[in-house]
Amino acid sequence: MPKMKTKSSAKKRFKVTGSGKIKRKHAFKSHILTKKSKKRKLALTHSALVHATDMKSIKQQLRII
């Protein structure tokens, strides 16, 4: 049986850290930035961790489980 392929969309959007947590980027940072404050844009620049409730489905998409 061939190897299972990971979902390419998930592969491009998520990164697994050394401790096994999954990093993601924030949305709302691509266009229409003039009405957003500098503080908000700076906060959206930093990466965040995936919430525990979404962890199982993302790990399945990345074929970690």
From Swiss-Prot:
* A single cellular component GO annotation: cytosolic large ribosomal subunit
* Any one of the GO BP annotations: translation
Q: Where is this region: Disordered?
A: 1-22
| Highest taxon, organism lineage | Bacteria
Keyword terms, alphabetized: Ribonucleoprotein, Ribosomal protein
Identify the stretch annotated as signal peptide in this record: none
GO molecular function list: structural constituent of ribosome
Q: Which NCBIfam families match?
A: rpmI_bact (TIGR00001)
Q: Which family does it belong to?
A: Belongs to the bacterial ribosomal protein bL35 family.
Q: Which HAMAP family match?
A: Ribosomal_bL35
Name recorded for this polypeptide: Large ribosomal subunit protein bL35
Question: Which organism's genome codes for this protein?
Answer: Flavobacterium psychrophilum (strain ATCC 49511 / DSM 21280 / CIP 103535 / JIP02/86)
